[in-house]
UniProtKB/Swiss-Prot annotation:
Subcellular location field: Secreted, Cell wall, S-layer
Gene3D superfamilies: Serralysin-like metalloprotease, C-terminal (2.150.10.10)
GO cellular component, one term: S-layer
Species this chain originates from: Synechocystis sp. (strain ATCC 27184 / PCC 6803 / Kazusa)
Protein's recorded name: S-layer protein
C-alpha cells in the first residue's frame, strides 16, 4: 500500500526541508507505491537534497554532532536546543551519545527523534511537524490548481521558505496559508478585455486594469470571479465619492503610483470614509457653513478652496476658517453684530453681503465712529443707554446718519458743560446728572441753579443763589436764602454776619448759609444777631470758633434767635460752634467734616424742652478724632439740667463715607433715655452713655417707637456704660463689628424702695464680629440676670457680674431656656460672674459656628467672680453649644444648700466636634449641715455666697468678731453672705452633658491651671460621632456613648466615700470603656467594643457585636466582677486575677475567657447561667497552673501549659489540657474547687488532656485531703483523649481522698455511667499504682474509680447503691496500662484501709433486662492489665478480713452483687493480663510482670470463711455456715466477654459468663509467630467455673498446644480442691503443687452427638474409656490423676464444634463442678506429657 501524501510530505521536510510537487506525489502513488516506510526513510536520507540540508551527512566522522542535532531540532520543530525547558540537557546528551553508537544512526536520526518524541507524548513537537506537512501540501495544491504540477528549483526553494516559518501554533499556519494564496493568485493575470476574450479561464486568476475600466466593469463576471483585482493606472479625472468607493470595493490592490482625486459635495466628502481619506486631493462643489469648512480643513488632503454662507456669530467666532474663504455670505443680516465683529468682517478683504447691523456699547461705537465698520453698517444701535454720556459724546452719537431711530440717552457732565450745551440736548435726554467733584458749587446763577436742580443728584451739591448776600455792615434783610461769607475788602478779610444783622426768613425752609473764618482785624468769635424765622442754619467754620448768643428778648445788637429748627455744622478746617439759649427747640443737628476735634454745643430755652418726649435727630458724618481731641456734642436746655429724652443718631449719610469712623462725645446731650442709631459710617462714642440712657436701638425695631422701621446701622459701633447707677439697659446693636460694654449694675428699687424691680440688662450685638461685655451685677426680687445676644458673626462675650435673685443667671443668645435667638459665628463667650438664688445658673446658647464658651474664674482676665451656680433648690449652668466645633469649659461649681435638690451643670454640644470640660464641682450641702442666718447681713447691698464654716466654729455675735472671721477666711471686709452654713459640702450633685453629633471630647475633672476638681455624680451622652468621655474627678458617673466609636473613661472615685461606681454604656459603634476604680457597670452596646473595668467590683454587659473585656477579675474579691452576654453577641474576656461567677453572670451568645496571668489563674463559672436557654463558654488557660470550672452548659475549656485543674461542670463540654500534669473533669472537680452540693447532672464532654501526667474524669473528679460524702449522679457520654504522659483517666467518677469516702451520700441510689470513649498515649511510668507501689504508665477506668490513702481511711457503703457501668470504649498505649471497664476501688499500702462494699451492686437486673457495662478495651503495646468490670485492690496491716474489721468487706449486713457486662478486651502487643469480669487483688509486686505468678497476690473472698487444718467438727460446720451465708450476701454474675490477647505472652481470665477468648494464632504472612509463645488462660474455682449449670462455657480460639497453657487455681474451695467430708477433722484436698501437676489424658471422643452443653457432658460419661463411673484416688499425700478428654461433636445442633473436658478430681462427671471449654482453631494436639499445656497455681482472682 502506498505511503500517504502526509507521510511523504513529512519525510521530505524531515530530511530536506523542501516541499513536494503534484508530480512528486503522483510518483509515490504509482511507481513508488510498494516502497515501505523504512525504505522511504533510507531514500530520503541518502538523497542529495538531504546532504545539502545536513552537511553532517557529508563528513559524519569529523562533523559536529551537537550542531547536527541542533539542525534537526530546528528543521523538524523550530526548537532551539539551547532552551533547556524544551530540550533538557539529559535528552541532548542522550542523542549526541546515540549518534556515536552506530553509523546507521546518522541517517536515521531525524526519523528516530520524531518516533521518540511521539512515544514520550511531546505533542508540541508532533504538532509542529504536522503543521509543516499540512502547509507543504497546501502549497502543492495551490500551484496545482493554477496548473503548475512540476516545481522549478525556485518553487522548491519558495516552498521551503514558507515551511520553515511554521511551528506548533495556529498563527504560524495561517500566516503561511496567506502567503500561499498570494503566490497562487499571481500565476494568472488578465485585463478585463483579455479575460472576456479567454474562453477557459484558470480556476485562479488576476484582473489587472485601469481604474476607469475597473469602475466601469465592476459588475462584470470576469471581474467578480477573479481571485485578485489590481488597478494599474490612475483615473483620468477626479472621481465622485461614489466612484471612488466602487474602485476601492472592486480592486484588491492598487499598483504602485496609482492615486485618485475627489470632487463632490461637502456632505458626500465628509461621509466618504476611505474613499476620501485615501484620495490624493479633495475638492468640493458647493458653498458651506463655517463648521463644515472647519471639518473640510481638518482633512489632510483638502485643496482649501471654499465659500462660506453662515451667521455672523459663527463667521466671527472662527476667524481662521472665515479668513480663508473666497467669499462670505451672511445668513442672518438682521441679527446685530458688535463693533469688533463688524470690524472683523470689514477686515476680511473679501466680498461680504448683504449689509449688517451694529449693536454695541456707546464707548465701543464712539471709538470706531469713523471706521468702515460703523460707516458701512445698515444701522447702529447703542445697547447701554443707561450709561451716562458726556455732552460731547451725546452730540457725536446723534450725528450718525445710521443711528437707530429709537436711541435714548442720559448725560453726566460738569455744570459748566451742561450750561454750555444746547438746550435741545438736555431736553432730549432721559435725565442728566452733575459730575463736579466738589459738592460745594459756591454761588451760582439762577439759570445754573435751574440746571442743578434738574439734575438727578442735585441733593449732593451745595450752592448759593445770590438772593440775599450779607455784607460786613449791618444787614436788615428778609428772604428765603441768606448767604454770609467772608469777603475781602481793601485786602482785609471780614465776616459778613455780625451782631447788628437782623435777618427775617420768608417762604419755605428759609436757610442761612454761613462761612466763618478768622477776620484780618479785630477777630470776633461771639456775636449776637437777630435771626427770626430762619429754620435752617448751615455753618462752615474755617479755623475759627463761632458763638451765637440768643437772649430771650428781641433787641437788635442783643441777639435773639427764634424759629431755628435745623443746624448743619461743617468744620472742614476746624472751629467750635456754640449756639446759646435758642428760643426754639431744634429738630435736627448735623455735624460733618469735623476732623480736628472741634466741638458743637447748643443750649435751648428751658421751656422749649420742658416736656418728657422731646426728640432730636443728630447726624454725624466724617467726624474724626485728632489725636487726643474728640469732637464733643453738647445739647441741653439753657439751665443744663434738661434735654431731649429721645435721640436719633445717624452716622454717615453717603456711600462715599462708608468705612470712615465717626468718633464723638455725646455725654453732653443730657437727659437722653432712648437712642436710635442708623447710618453707614463706623461710630465710636468716646465717653460713657449717661445714666439716664436705658434704650439703645441700632436696628430700627419697635424698641423705640419713634425710630421703628429705620435702616439697620451697618457701621462698627463702639459704646460703653460706666458704673454710674441707672435703670436696666436694652441695647440692640447694628450689623457692624461692635464693641459694647456695660459696667452699670442692674439694681433698681421700687418707688417705696422696698423691692428690687430690676431684672438685668439686655445686650444684642446683631450681625458682625462684636465684643460685648457686661461687668455690672444683676439683682432682682424675681428673675435676675443679664441677657446677651451675639447675633451673627464671630462675637466675644464677657459677663463678669453677679446674678442674684430667686431665679438667677445670665442668658447668652436667648431670653430663656427654650428660645435661641442668635449666635451664628465663631463666638468667644466668657462668664465669670456667679449666679446666686433659689434656682441659679447661667444659660448659654453658642449657636452655629465654632464657639469657645467658658464659665468660671479666668485668671487671664482681670475680672472678678468664679462662675459658680449657688442655689437653694436648683443650681447649675445650662449650655447649648450649637452647631460646628465648639469648646465649652466650666470651672465654676454648682451648689445647692438643700441637699434634697439638684445641683449640676448641663451642656448640650450640638453638632460638630466639641470639646467640653467641666472642672467645677457639683455639690450640695451635707444633710447634716446647719444653715444659720448671718446677723450682719446688709440687705441694702448685694449678697455674696453663703459662707461655709467649720462644724466647731462659733457664730460671731459682734461686728468685730465677724470681721476677724472674714479675715481668717481671706475674705474682704465688705463680704456680705446671707447665711452661715456650718458643715461641709457633699459631692452629690450631677453635671449632665450631651455631646450631640460629631466627634466630641467630654472631660469631667481638674483642668490644668484652673480651679475645681470636677467632682460629682455626672451624666454624659456622646450621641453621634466618635466621642471621648472621661471622669478624673471624684464621684460616680453615667456615660452613654451614643452612635460612633466612643471612648468612655470612668473615674477612680473615692472608695472611702463610696464614689467611683460608674455606669458606662457604649451604645452604637466600636467603643472603648474603662471604668477605673470603683464598682462600675459597663455595657458595650451595638458594635465591637473593648471594656476594661479597672479596680473594683465591675459588671460588664455584652449586648451586641464582638466585645472585649480586658480585665475581668480586677476586683475587690474573686466574685466582684461579673458579666452577661446577650443573644447574637460575642465576647472575648481577659481574666487578669482569680475570678468566680455568681448568678449575675450568664451567656446567651458566644463568650471566650482567657486567663491572662502567665503564672496561672482561676476561673469558676459554676454559678453562672441562671436564665434558661443559655450557652456555654470557651475558657483558655495560660502557661501557669490554672483552675477552671465550667458552667452547666456546653463549654470549651483549654488549659494550656501548666498543671491545670479543670472541671467542665454540666453540659457537653470540650476540654483540652495541653502540656503538663493536669486535673480534668468533664463536669465536677473537687480539689477542693467546687462544693459538693454544687455537683450537677453531667454532660457529654469531649476532653483532650494533652501531654503531661494528667488526672481526668469525664464527669466527677475529687481529690481531697478530707473525708468526703460522695453524691453520684448519672454520667455523661464523654470522649476523652488522655494524651502523652502517665494519665489517670476515668470515664465518669474519680475520687481520691486522704480521708474516708462515704458512698452513702448519693441522693440518687442508682448511678448510671455514660458510654465513654477513652484513649491515651505513651506514658512515662509516672503513676504509682496504689497496690504494691508498682509504677505504671496509664490508668483507665470506664465508670467509677475510688482510692483512699492515709491511716485508717476507708471506702464504705452501708446503704444500697447501684452503679451501672456505661458501654465504654477504652484504648491504651505502649507501656504498662491498667484499664478497667467499670469500677476500680483501691486502698493504699500500709494504711490499714477498708473497702466496705456492703449493699454495693454493680449492674442491675430488671425483669428480663440486664443492665451492665458492655465495654470495649484495647491495651495496645506494653504489658497491660485489662479488666472488664471490677478491679479492687486493698493493702492493709490486718490482711483480708471479710466479715468485719479492716480489709475488703463484701455483703456484711447486706447484699453485694456484681453483674459483669459483655466486654470485648484486646491485649495488643506485650504480655497482657486480660480478665473478663472481676479481679480482687491484695498485692502487686514491683517490678510487675503479669506473667510472673510471684507478682500477684489475689484475694479469695471465701478464704477466711472456710475451715482450716486442725479445725474441730464444730468449727468445720460453722465454716460451712459462714460460707453459705456469704453466698447469700455476695453474688456474682459474669458477662459473656470476648478476650483477644494479640501479640505477646498473655494471661486470660474469662471469669463468669460464656466468654470468647482468642489467645492468638501465632501466624503471620511470613510464617513467623507474632502472638505470644506462652499464653495462659486462667480458670478459678467452682464459682468461677467455665461450666456453671452447664451453660457457662467459654470459647477459646487460637490455642497452640506447643506453647499455650491452661492454669488452674488449686487450694481450698477452689477448682481441683476435692470435696469436704463432713465430720472429718482434716479437709481433703488435691496434693498438687504448682509445676508438679499430673494429668491423665483419655482418648478423644471424635463422633459425639450434642444439641446442648449437657449433651457434651453426657458424651463424656457415655464414652469414658475407664468405665461408667470415673474414680480417682484422693488419699492424702498421694498424687492424684485428673482425667482430661477432647470431645468433637459430629452431629446434633453443636455439630462441628470441639470441647475439652477436665474433671475436678472428684470421680463423678458433673456439669456443676467439672470444667468444659470450647476450643476453636486449636493448633496441634495434646500430647501425653501435658505439663507444657496445664499448670496448677495457688491464686485467687
Amino acid at each position: 500500500m502506498a505511503l500517504s501524501p502526509n507521510v511523504i510530505a513529512a519525510l521530505q521536510i524531515m530530511y530536506t526541508g523542501r516541499g513536494v510537487s503534484a508530480s512528486d506525489l503522483n510518483w509515490w502513488a504509482t511507481d513508488g507505491a510498494n516502497i515501505t516506510y523504512a525504505e522511504a526513510v533510507a531514500l530520503f536520507a541518502s538523497s542529495p537534497d538531504a546532504a545539502i540540508k545536513y552537511p553532517f551527512f557529508q563528513a559524519p566522522q569529523t562533523a559536529d554532532k551537537r550542531q547536527y542535532v541542533a539542525q534537526v531540532f530546528a528543521n523538524l520543530y523550530n526548537i532551539d536546543i539551547n532552551d533547556t525547558s524544551l530540550v533538557p540537557t539529559e535528552e541532548l546528551d542522550y542523542w549526541i551519545n546515540w549518534l556515536s553508537l552506530s553509523p546507521d544512526n546518522y541517517l536515521d536520526f531525524p526519523n528516530a527523534l520524531n518516533n521518540a518524541s511521539a512515544a514520550a507524548g511531546l505533542t508540541d513537537r508532533l504538532e509542529a511537524l504536522t503543521n509543516k506537512a499540512d502547509v507543504s501540501l497546501s502549497y502543492t495544491e495551490a500551484l496545482s490548481t493554477a496548473g503548475v504540477n512540476t516545481f522549478t528549483e525556485a518553487q522548491y526553494a519558495e516552498a521551503a521558505g514558507i515551511i520553515a516559518t511554521v511551528d506548533d501554533t495556529n498563527a504560524s499556519v495561517l500566516a503561511a496559508e496567506a502567503q500561499i494564496v498570494e503566490i497562487a493568485a499571481s500565476l494568472s493575470v488578465f485585463t478585463i478585455a483579455q479575460a472576456q476574450a479567454t474562453p477557459n479561464l484558470p480556476p485562479a486568476y488576476t484582473i489587472s486594469d485601469t481604474a476607469d475600466n475597473l469602475i466601469a466593469g465592476a459588475d462584470d463576471p470576469v471581474v467578480t470571479g477573479a481571485n485578485n483585482v489590481i488597478a494599474n493606472q490612475s483615473p483620468a479625472a477626479p472621481l465622485s465619492v461614489e466612484d471612488a468607493n466602487i474602485l476601492l470595493a472592486t480592486a484588491d490592490e492598487l499598483a504602485a503610483g496609482v492615486t485618485w482625486d475627489i470632487l463632490d459635495t461637502a456632505a458626500d466628502v465628509l461621509a466618504g470614509g476611505a474613499a476620501v481619506s485615501g484620495a490624493a486631493s479633495v475638492g468640493i462643489t458647493d458653498i458651506v457653513d463655517v463648521a463644515t469648512a472647519s471639518q473640510l480643513l481638518a482633512l489632510g488632503n483638502f485643496d482649501g478652496v471654499y465659500a462660506i454662507a453662515d451667521t455672523s456669530a459663527n463667521i466671527v467666532a472662527d476667524p481662521g476658517v472665515s479668513g480663508g474663504a473666497t467669499a462670505i455670505t451672511l445668513s442672518d443680516p438682521d441679527v446685530p453684530v458688535s463693533v469688533a465683529s463688524a470690524t472683523f468682517l470689514q477686515g476680511l478683504g473679501i466680498p461680504v453681503g448683504p449689509s449688517y447691523i451694529v449693536e454695541d456699547t456707546s464707548a465701543n461705537i464712539l471709538a470706531a465712529l469713523s471706521t468702515p465698520a460703523i460707516v458701512n453698517a445698515a444701522e447702529v444701535i447703542v445697547n447701554n443707554t443707561d450709561v451716562p454720556l458726556s455732552v460731547a459724546q451725546a452730540e457725536d452719537l446723534l450725528s450718525l446718519p445710521n443711528l437707530n431711530a429709537g436711541f435714548t440717552y442720559i448725560i453726566a457732565d460738569t455744570l459748566d458743560n451742561l450750561s454750555a450745551a444746547p438746550s435741545t440736548l438736555l431736553d432730549g435726554a432721559v435725565s442728566y446728572s452733575l459730575t463736579n467733584t466738589n459738592p460745594d458749587l459756591g454761588v451760582i446763577t439762577e439759570a445754573e441753579a435751574v440746571i442743578v436742580n434738574g439734575a438727578t443728584n442735585a441733593s449732593d451739591f451745595n450752592f448759593l443763589v445770590a438772593d440775599v448776600i450779607l455784607t460786613p455792615q449791618a444787614d436788615i434783610r428778609s428772604g428765603n436764602s441768606f448767604l454770609s461769607v467772608a469777603v475781602v475788602e481793601g485786602g482785609s478779610i471780614f465776616n459778613t454776619l455780625n451782631s447788628n444783622d437782623r435777618l427775617t426768613g420768608t417762604g419755605e425752609d428759609p436757610t442761612l448759609s454761613l462761612t466763618w473764618q478768622e477776620a484780618t482785624f479785630g477777630n470776633i468769635n461771639t456775636i449776637f444777631p437777630v435771626l427770626d424765622g430762619i429754620e435752617t442754619l448751615v455753618a462752615t467754620l474755617i479755623e475759627n470758633d463761632l458763638t451765637l448768643v440768643s437772649n430771650d428778648f428781641d433787641v437788635v445788637g442783643q441777639g435773639f434767635i427764634t424759629g431755628l429748627k435745623n443746624v448743619a455744622a461743617s468744620g472742614t478746617k476746624g472751629g467750635d460752634l456754640e449756639l446759646i439759649n435758642l428760643q426754639t427747640a431744634l429738630e435736627t443737628v448735623s455735624v460733618t467734616n469735623y476732623f480736628f476735634g472741634d466741638d458743637v454745643s447748643f443750649s435751648i430755652a428751658d421751656p422749649e424742652l420742658a416736656g418728657d418726649n422731646d426728640l432730636l435727630l443728630l447726624t454725624v458724618d466724617q467726624v474724626t478724632e485728632d489725636g487726643p481731641d474728640v469732637t464733643s456734642i453738647k445739647i441741653s436746655d439753657f439751665s443744663g439740667n434738661g434735654g431731649y429724652e429721645t435721640l436719633g443718631l445717624t452716622s454717615g449719610v453717603t456711600t462715599s463715607s462708608k468705612g470712615n469712623t465717626n468718633t464723638v462725645d455725646i455725654e453732653g446731650i443730657v437727659a437722653v433715655e432712648s437712642i436710635g442709631i442708623t447710618g453707614i459710617e463706623n461710630l465710636t462714642l468716646s465717653t460713657s452713655l449717661i445714666g439716664s440712657v436705658v434704650k439703645v436701638d441700632a436696628t430700627g425695631s419697635a424698641l423705640i417707637p419713634e425710630f421703628e422701621g429705620r435702616e439697620v446701622f451697618t457701621g462698627d459701633l463702639k459704646a460703653f456704660f460706666d458704673d454710674r447707677p441707672g435703670g436696666d439697659i436694652t441695647f440692640l446693636s447694628g450689623s457692624g463689628n461692635d464693641e459694647i460694654s456695660i459696667a452699670r449694675d442692674a439694681f433698681t428699687l421700687s418707688e417705696d424702695l422696698k423691692d428690687v424691680i430690676s431684672k438685668g440688662h439686655i445686650l444684642d450685638g446683631g450681625a458682625g464680629n462684636d465684643e460685648l461685655t457686661i461687668t455690672g451685677d444683676a439683682f432682682s426680687d424675681t428673675d435676675a440676670g443679664h441677657t446677651v445676644i451675639g447675633g451673627e458673626g464671630n462675637d466675644s462675650i464677657l459677663l463678669t457680674g453677679v446674678a442674684e435673685g430667686p431665679i438667677a443667671g445670665h442668658v447668652v443668645n436667648s431670653f430663656d431656656l427654650i428660645n435661641e435667638v442668635g449666635g451664628a459665628g465663631d463666638d468667644d463667650i466668657n462668664i465669670s460672674g456667679d449666679a446666686i438664688g433659689d434656682s441659679a445658673g447661667h444659660v448659654v446658647f453658642g449657636g452655629a459656628g465654632e464657639d469657645d464658651i467658658f464659665i468660671g474664674f479666668d485668671k487671664t482676665l482681670a475680672v472678678s467672680g468664679n462662675g459658680a451656680a449657688l442655689g437653694v433648690d436648683l443650681a447649675g449652668h445650662v449650655v447649648f453649644a450649637g452647631d460646628d466645633d465648639d469648646t465649652v469649659r466650666i470651672t465654676g461649681d454648682s451648689f445647692t444648700s438643700d441637699s434634697a435638690n439638684g445641683s449640676g451643670h448641663s451642656v448640650e454640644g450640638g453638632t460638630g466636634d466639641d470639646l467640653i470640660e467641666i472642672s467645677g464641682d457639683a455639690l450640695t450641702a451635707d444633710p447634716d449641715s446647719e444653715t444659720i442666718a448671718n446677723p450682719f447681713f446688709d440687705d441694702s447691698e448685694p449678697s455674696d455666697l453663703d459662707l461655709f464654716i467649720a462644724a466647731d466654729q462659733p457664730i460671731p455675735t459682734t461686728e468685730e468678731q465677724y470681721q476677724v472671721l472674714l479675715a481668717q477666711l481671706g475674705l474682704p471686709a465688705d463680704y456680705n453672705p446671707r447665711n452661715f452654713i456650718r458643715g461641709v459640702a457633699a459631692i452629690s450633685g450631677a453635671h449632665t452633658v450631651r455631646g450631640g453629633e460629631g466627634n466630641d471630647v467630654i472631660l469631667f475633672g481638674p483642668i490644668a491651671g484652673e480651679p475645681g476638681n470636677g467632682d460629682g455624680q455626672h451624666l454624659a451622652f456622646g450621641d453621634e460621632g466618635d466621642d471621648f468621655i472621661e471622669m478624673t474627678g471624684i464621684g460616680s458617673v453615667e456615660f452613654n456613648g451614643g452612635a460612633g466609636d466612643d471612648t468612655l473613661v470612668g473615674g477612680d472615685g473615692d472608695p472611702i466615700l463610696g464614689f467611683g461606681n460608674d455606669i458606662l454604656n457604649g451604645d452604637e459603634g466600636n467603643d472603648f470603656l474603662f471604668g477605673g476604680k470603683g464598682n462600675d457597670n459597663l455595657q458595650g452596646g451595638e458594635g465591637d467594643d473593648i471594656m476594661s473595668g479597672g479596680e473594683g467590683d465591675d459588671f460588664f454587659f455584652v449586648d451586641a457585636g464582638f466585645d472585649v473585656i480586658e480585665d475581668l477579675g480586677d476586683a475587690n474579691s474573686e466574685t466582684g466582677d461579673q458579666f452577661q452576654v446577650s443573644e447574637d453577641a460575642e465576647a472575648e474576656i481577659r481574666v487578669v486575677q482569680d475570678w468566680e461567677a455568681t448568678g449575675l453572670t450568664f451567656n446567651l451568645g458566644i463568650a471566650t475567657l482567657t486567663i491572662e496571668n502567665p503564672g496561672g489563674g482561676s476561673v469558676d463559672l459554676s454559678a453562672s447561667n441562671v436564665p434558661p436557654n443559655t450557652n456555654g463558654y470557651t475558657v483558655i488557660g495560660n502557661i501557669g497552673d490554672d483552675e477552671i470550672i465550667g458552667s452547666r452548659d456546653d463549654d470549651s475549656i483549654f488549659g494550656g501549659r501548666g498543671e491545670d485543674s479543670i472541671a467542665g461542670l454540666g453540659g457537653d463540654d470540650i476540654i483540652e489540657g495541653n502540656d503538663d500534669d493536669d486535673f480534668i473533669s468533664g463536669d465536677s472537680l473537687l480539689l477542693p474547687l467546687l462544693p459538693l452540693e454544687e455537683i450537677l447532672p453531667f454532660g457529654n464532654d469531649d476532653i483532650d488532656a494533652g501531654s503531661g501526667n494528667d488526672v481526668i474524669a469525664g464527669d466527677l473528679l475529687v481529690v481531697t485531703g478530707d473525708d468526703i460524702d460522695l453524691n453520684l449522679f448519672n454520667g455523661g457520654k464523654d470522649t476523652i483523649e488522655a494524651g502523652l504522659g502517665s494519665d489517670i483517666t476515668v470515664g465518669d467518677w474519680s475520687i481520691g481522698a486522704f480521708g474516708d469516702i462515704d458512698l452513702n451520700a448519693s441522693l440518687e441510689r442508682t448511678a448510671i455511667g455514660g458510654d465513654d470513649t477513652i484513649t491515651t498515649k505513651q506514658g512515662d511510668n509516672g503513676i504509682v499504682f496504689p497496690i504494691g507501689q508498682v509504677a505504671i504508665d496509664n490508668f483507665l477506668v470506664g465508670d467509677l474509680a475510688a482510692a483512699v490513702d492515709g491511716v485508717g481511711n476507708d471506702i464504705f457503703l452501708t446503704e444500697t447503691l447501684t452503679v451501672i457501668g456505661g458501654d465504654d470504649t477504652m484504648t491504651g498505649a505502649d507501656g504498662l496500662d491498667v484499664i478497667v471497664g467499670d469500677v476500680g476501688l483501691f486502698g493504699f499500702e500500709f494504711n490499714d484501709s477498708e473497702i466496705n462494699l456492703t449493699n454495693f451492686k454493680l449492674g442491675q437486673v430488671n425483669g428480663s433486662t440486664v443492665s451492665a457495662g458492655d465495654d470495649s478495651i484495647t491495651g495496645e503495646g506494653g504489658n497491660d492489665i485489662l479488666v472488664g468490670d471490677l478491679f479492687v485492690g486493698v493493702i492493709n496491716n490486718n490482711g483480708i478480713i471479710i466479715d468485719g474489721g479492716k480489709g475488703f468487706q463484701l455483703g456484711k449486713d447486706g447484699t453485694t452483687s456484681f453483674i459483669g457486662g459483655d466486654d470485648s478486651i484486646s491485649g495488643g502487643d506485650g504480655n497482657d493480663f486480660l480478665a473478663g469480669d472481676f479481679v480482687l487483688v491484695d498485692q502487686l509486686s514491683a517490678p510487675f510482670d503479669p506473667l510472673d505468678p510471684n507478682d500477684w497476690t489475689f484475694v479469695n473472698p471465701y478464704a477466711t470463711l472456710q475451715g482450716q487444718a486442725g479445725d474441730s467438727k464444730a468449727q468445720a460446720a460453722q465454716a460451712a455456715i459462714n460460707l453459705a451465708q456469704l453466698r447469700l450476701e455476695f453474688r456474682a454474675v459474669g458477662g459473656d466477654d470476648e478476650l483477644v490477647g494479640g501479640r505477646g505472652n498473655d494471661t486470660f481470665y474469662g471469669g463468669l459468663g460464656a466468654d470468647t477468648i482468642d489467645i492468638g494464632n501465632d501466624v503471620t504472612v511470613g510464617g513467623v509467630g507474632v502472638n505470644g509463645a506462652n499464653e495462659i488462660w486462667y480458670m478459678n474455682g467452682a464459682f468461677e467455673n467455665a461450666a456453671v449449670n452447664g451453660a457457662n462455657v467459654d470459647n477459646i480460639t487460637g490455642f497452640n498446644v506447643n506453647n499455650d497453657k491452661f492454669v488452674f487455681a488449686a487450694g481450698a474451695n477452689n477448682f481441683l480442691s476435692g470435696d469436704a467430708t463432713s465430720g472429718l477433722a482434716v479437709q481433703r484436698v488435691l496434693n498438687l503443687q504448682a509445676g508438679n501437676t499430673v494429668f491423665n489424658l483419655n482418648d478423644p471422643i471424635l463422633n459425639a452427638s450434642a444439641n446442648n452443653i449437657n449433651d457434651v457432658f453426657l458424651a463424656v460419661n457415655a464414652d469414658n474409656s475407664v468405665g461408667a463411673s470415673l474414680s480417682f484416688s484422693l488419699l492424702p499425700g498421694l498424687p492424684s490423676l485428673v482425667e482430661m478428654q477432647q470431645i468433637n461433636v459430629s452431629s446434633g445442633a453443636l455439630a462441628g464444634r470441639e470441647f475439652l473436658f477436665i474433671n475436678n478430681g472428684v470421680a463423678a462427671v458433673s456439669s456443676q463442678d467439672d470444667f468444659l471449654v470450647e476450643l476453636t482453631g486449636i493448633s496441634g494436639t495434646f500430647g501425653l506429657d501435658l505439663t507444657p499445656n496445664f499448670e496448677v497455681r495457688e491464686f485467687y482472682a
